[in-house]
UniProtKB/Swiss-Prot annotation:
Residues 56-82 form a coiled coil. Residues 7-39 form the LisH domain. WD repeats lie at residues 106-147, 148-187, 190-229, 232-271, 274-333, 336-375, 378-410. InterPro entries: Dynein_regulator_LIS1, G-protein_beta_WD-40_rep, LIS1_N, LisH, PAC1-like_LisH-like_dom, WD40/YVTN_repeat-like_dom_sf, WD40_repeat_CS, WD40_repeat_dom_sf. It comes from Salmo salar (Atlantic salmon). The gene is pafah1b1-1. Keywords: Cell cycle, Cell division, Coiled coil, Cytoplasm, Cytoskeleton, Developmental protein, Differentiation, Microtubule, Mitosis, Neurogenesis, Repeat, Transport, WD repeat. This is Lissencephaly-1 homolog A. It is found in: Cytoplasm, Cytoskeleton; Cytoplasm, Cytoskeleton, Microtubule organizing center, Centrosome. Signal peptide: none annotated. It holds the Pfam family LisH_PAC1.
Length: 410
């Protein structure tokens, strides 16, 4: 590339300034003589530090170019994977596509949980900043903040109508919110340590919670009384989730096990122990996934009767496991994440599993073939939570980078 006379003169003056300001006197005087520079103090102020500025801006631009190239490659891949035909793709096969539709800021600490509202076009996020925030996922607008907890909010859960929201916190309480008036209508005390997980039961009459005090408790929504305590885990209980009809609850713990409990009798129906580290998260597979699961695993479970139920678990051992609860067996292990798995769920269409992890990615698994079919660099930091909308083509993720991201699926 040939420089014009003016550009050459500017470059020479910038080099001369660099040599002089860094004390290379001999090189400076030789260069000045050879480049035939007439150094003028006023004129030279313009070139002070210019070489370093240009150098750093070149590096910055190079980084930007690389980022844009990778986005371009991603976009090309999207097109070859069925850009124009995407319209014809069956909604059961919709998966999140980069880049995100919205990156929402507002929390002042890591985001711990994100969930969609079952009816309205809003989603809710919980954070270590002790707040719960409500956002419109279609417009990306922030709607309101629910304040009441005095420490990190660890988990949130809607009832099936979306009129009630339950939250739990490191402040050792569980709160029930009227999601129409956005007021806290009840605070439940009873755990002796950080309450790490909460879920409203499918019938809407009870709430289950899990705590660092090693117990799981069941609470009556109408009164706020604790009506049952499930004991058995030997360490911090990380998460609790009821199955679809509310007859079973699953829990996972720092003791590296997953347990399944019969709600009516409080007995532990299964203790699933194959993970090699803390089990961070669990998720029940919906019935829509049962045919694919049976096909993928050739599971022997109740060939005559109803299959399953099936449960997913994600661990700090970086794996996701699928279990047939009726026989207490691990059906498959998905390996691919490079760090702790923090969340996973079965795609509403039943064919895929989505997961997020501390490797900052969101992954889509074709579990029938036990392979990761897509990896999205989702956040700048650990991805702590994800949710897939049951009817609309959206996925939401939350992260330690304090943002909530909305991903469109197609």
């Amino acid at each position: 590339m040939v420089l014009s006379q003016r550009q050459r003169d500017e470059l020479n003056r910038a080099i001369a300034d660099y040599l002089r300001s860094n004390g290379y006197e001999e090189a400076y005087s030789t260069f000045k003589k050879e480049a035939e520079l007439d150094m003028n103090e006023e004129l030279d102020k313009k070139y002070a530090g210019l070489l370093e500025k240009k150098w750093t801006s070149v590096i910055r631009l190079q980084k930007k170019v690389m980022e844009l190239e990778s986005k371009l490659n991603e976009a090309k891949e999207e097109i070859t994977l069925g850009g124009p035909i995407a319209q014809k793709r069956d909604p059961k096969e919709w998966i999140p596509r980069p880049p995100e539709k919205y990156a929402l800021s507002g929390h002042r600490s890591p985001v711990t949980r994100v969930i969609f509202h079952p009816v309205f076009s809003v989603m809710v996020s919980a954070s270590e900043d002790a707040t719960i925030k409500v956002w419109d996922y279609e417009t990306g607008d922030f709607e309101r903040t629910l304040k009441g907890h005095t420490d990190s909010v660890q988990d949130i859960s809607f009832d099936h109508t979306g009129k009630l929201l339950a939250s739990c916190s490191a402040d050792m309480t569980i709160k029930l919110w009227d999601f129409q008036g956005f007021e806290c209508i009840r605070t439940m005390h009873g755990h002796d340590h950080n309450v790490s997980s909460v879920a409203i039961m499918p019938n809407g009459d009870h709430i289950v919670s899990a705590s660092r005090d090693k117990t799981i408790k069941m609470w009556e929504v109408a009164t706020g009384y604790c009506v049952k305590t499930f004991t058995g885990h030997r360490e911090w209980v990380r998460m609790v989730r009821p199955n679809q009809d509310g007859t079973l609850i699953a829990s996972c713990s720092n003791d590296q096990t997953v347990r399944v409990w019969v709600v009516a009798s409080k007995e532990c129906k299964a203790e699933l122990r194959e993970h090699e580290h803390v089990v961070e998260c669990i998720s029940w597979a919906p019935e829509s996934a049962h045919p694919t699961i049976l096909e993928a695993t050739g599971s022997e479970s109740k060939k005559s009767g109803k299959p399953g139920p099936f449960l997913l678990s994600g661990s700090r051992d970086k794996t996701i496991k699928m279990w047939d609860v009726s026989i207490g067996m691990c059906l498959m292990t998905l390996v691919g994440h490079d760090n702790w798995v923090r969340g996973m769920l079965v795609h509403p269409g039943g064919k895929f599993i989505l997961s997020c992890a501390d490797d900052k990615t969101l992954r889509i698994w074709d579990y029938k073939n036990k392979r990761c079919m897509k990896t999205l660099g989702a956040h700048e930091h650990f991805v702590t939570s994800l949710d897939f909308h049951k009817n609309a083509p959206y996925v939401v993720t939350g992260s330690v980078d304090q943002t909530v991201k909305v991903w469109e699926c197609r």
